[in-house]
């Protein structure tokens, strides 16, 4: 990495630790024309001693798509130009699903020109007017001086523009929390969501536990959800200044929903279900500084990689260790992340600039893995994680979202409740389409392969009423007096026009990650596909008699209990004891309800 650019953004990056500048910042000697007459030629390392740098630093050229916009300056635009700028801002906000980043003082080809103080002030004033016009808020993320070939101080300014889309109450991001038992997952979430530091004995996590045995043992055994909000100015909104989840939702323009998963190996099936069913945008992998990579840490890391869930790492409990111990744990993580099969670029976050950069790099490149070192007791570096979460944009683009919303309604049933005076309530994620209050849907498959009609009475997101649910959003749906006994986890609620198909036999292309001996016909495994979790038997291995660790094959599975709703292309994960494998569904043998009753023995 060029030291000039590193100094420009105050970034700090460990050797081999990846980039530390904002928006893929890099230096180029030749490449593109420069309107300010920057010299061309071979790039040099370092600054000129005792003088200004001659080689201008660059960002990558501006992309037409995405939520990042470069502007050299925005000084006194004409009315026509202003309207064009407003339209452009709407486009960038749409691309970022409510968030956009403006780089002021940067040309379209990425050249960091910078602006004098008066021009920067005028440009930010225009940006404020643009934001007001579209109903957005702006926050200055950082300012840095650009001092090559100029005696006049020049700056570039990075600005976050945030606007909650008209069809949403707030921006939403789901983060699954992984890590070994006793690494501090629930404690960290308690500190973030309650606004109070831990006392070193687990006080912060008590409000997160759902069962008495969890409080007694201090270990999570079930999936729980916690929320952290940010207002339009980037300030944290949590239970320290809000009594209820409803108040947090009302005060926030962005919501982070943490999915707290179990760390103990005994509850691994619950952790896998949380990753496959709740469709997290990304995952937070917690590693204790004093134990390093231990227990289920590697297994959880492998799950995130297998399911292609982007993840970042938090090294906790740094207050318990010497600095050398923390550094050893970070080096251990960096070695694992760079190994074949992982191929990640670790980036150690040590400053607010690093946190801003990490959020942008993480969204743009799936290979970048930010690493935070913090303490839930002393609060050390906790603010850096909050900055990262505030700036982190949605990881799916607007086009993908629009395509999903154009499809027919499909809602995954992950949880089932009975609420007094409300009736049966189901919780889950809308995989595709749009769901409204009063919609008529069908739910299934039942044990005998049927789909039953029902009506959506009301919808809630984060305990707040919601009239419309869109693809990718998680919510609870009230079903009135629908019989709870007819429902189970793994079902789907779909539009009647979809004419859903079910199967008891399906084929998948798999990779056997580990098996002690040979994987043969007749072997039984627990299959996870989305919110489906059921025991299946291997009926056939195509073109082979057996499989060994690391081998690939197309395998035919048969569910043992009841038929399921599966789609071709869905990611698949199976396990039984130490046996593990991943793959995707390649074919489903559709059957009718009558055939299901015959084949499943009803």
Swiss-Prot record:
Q: Which GO terms describe its molecular function?
A: alpha-aminoacyl-tRNA binding; GTP binding; GTPase activity; identical protein binding
Signal peptide coordinates: none
Residues reported to bind GTP: 179-186, 260-264, 316-319
Describe what upregulates or represses it: Up-regulated in thioglycolate-elicited mouse peritoneal macrophages.
Whether Transmembrane counts among this entry's keywords is no
- Entry keyword annotation includes Nucleotide-binding: yes
Q: Identify the keywords attached in UniProt to this record, alphabetized.
A: GTP-binding, Nucleotide-binding
Write one Pfam family the protein is assigned to. Answer: GTP_EFTU
Could you tell me which SUPFAM superfamilies the record lists for this protein?
A: EF-Tu/eEF-1alpha/eIF2-gamma C-terminal domain, P-loop containing nucleoside triphosphate hydrolases, Translation proteins
Give residue spans, biased composition: Gly residues: 29-39
The organs and tissues expressing this protein are described as: Predominantly expressed in thymus, spleen, and testis. Expressed at lower levels in brain, heart, lung, kidney, and skeletal muscle. In testis, specifically expressed in spermatocytes and round spermatids.
Which named protein is this? GTP-binding protein 2
Q: Which gene encodes it?
A: Gtpbp2
């Amino acid at each position: 990495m060029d030291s000039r650019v590193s100094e420009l953004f105050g970034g700090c990056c460990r050797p081999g630790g990846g980039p530390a500048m904002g928006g893929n910042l890099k230096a180029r000697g030749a490449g593109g024309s420069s309107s300010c007459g920057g010299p061309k030629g071979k790039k040099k390392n370092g600054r000129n001693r005792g003088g200004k740098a001659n080689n201008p630093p660059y960002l990558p050229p501006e992309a037409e798509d995405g939520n990042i916009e470069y502007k050299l300056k925005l000084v006194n635009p004409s009315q026509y130009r202003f309207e064009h700028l407003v339209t452009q801002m709407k486009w960038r906000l749409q691309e970022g699903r409510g968030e956009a980043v403006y780089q002021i003082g940067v040309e379209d080809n990425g050249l960091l020109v910078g602006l004098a103080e008066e021009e920067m002030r005028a440009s930010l004033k225009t940006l404020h007017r643009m934001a007001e016009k579209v109903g957005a808020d702006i926050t200055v993320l950082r300012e840095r001086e650009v001092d090559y070939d100029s005696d006049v101080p020049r700056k570039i300014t990075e600005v976050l523009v945030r606007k909650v889309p008209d069809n949403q109450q707030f921006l939403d991001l789901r983060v699954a929390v992984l890590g070994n038992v006793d690494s501090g997952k629930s404690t960290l979430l308690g500190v973030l969501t309650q606004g109070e530091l831990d006392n070193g004995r687990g006080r912060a996590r008590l409000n997160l536990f759902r069962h008495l045995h969890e409080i007694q043992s201090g270990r999570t055994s079930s999936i729980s959800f916690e929320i952290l909000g940010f207002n339009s100015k980037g300030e944290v909104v949590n239970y320290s200044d809000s009594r209820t989840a409803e108040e947090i939702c009302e005060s926030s323009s962005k919501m982070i929903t943490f999915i707290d998963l179990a760390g103990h190996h005994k509850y691994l099936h619950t952790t896998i279900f949380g990753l496959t069913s709740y469709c997290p945008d990304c995952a937070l992998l917690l590693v204790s500084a004093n134990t390093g990579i231990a227990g289920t840490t590697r297994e959880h890391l492998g799950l995130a990689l297998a399911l292609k869930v982007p993840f970042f790492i938090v090294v906790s409990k740094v207050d318990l260790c010497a600095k050398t111990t923390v550094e050893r744990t970070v080096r251990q993580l960096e070695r694992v992340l760079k190994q074949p099969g992982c191929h990640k670029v670790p980036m150690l976050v040590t400053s607010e600039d690093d946190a801003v950069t990490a959020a942008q790099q993480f969204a743009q490149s799936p290979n970048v893995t930010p690493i935070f070192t913090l303490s839930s007791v002393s609060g050390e570096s906790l603010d850096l994680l909050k900055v990262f979460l505030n700036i982190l944009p949605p990881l799916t683009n607007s086009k993908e979202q629009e395509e999903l919303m154009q499809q027919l309604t499909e809602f995954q049933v992950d949880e089932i409740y009975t609420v007094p005076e409300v009736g049966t309530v189901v919780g889950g994620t809308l995989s595709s389409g749009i769901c409204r209050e009063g919609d008529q849907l069908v739910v299934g498959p039942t044990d005998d392969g049927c789909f039953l009609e029902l009506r959506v009475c009301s919808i809630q997101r984060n305990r707040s009423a919601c009239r419309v649910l869109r693809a990718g959003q998680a919510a609870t749906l009230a079903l009135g007096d629908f019989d709870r006994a007819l429902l189970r986890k793994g079902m789907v609620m779909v539009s009647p026009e979809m004419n859903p198909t079910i199967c008891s036999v399906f084929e998948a292309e798999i990779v056997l990650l580990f098996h002690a001996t040979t994987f043969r016909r007749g072997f039984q495994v627990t299959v996870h596909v989305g919110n489906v979790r059921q025991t299946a038997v291997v009926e056939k291995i195509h073109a082979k008699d057996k499989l060994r660790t690391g081998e690939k094959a197309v395998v035919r599975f048969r569910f043992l209990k009841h038929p399921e709703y599966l789609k071709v292309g869905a990611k698949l994960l199976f396990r039984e004891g130490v046996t593990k494998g991943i793959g995707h569904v390649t074919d489903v043998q559709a059957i009718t309800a009558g055939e299901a009753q015959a084949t499943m023995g009803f």
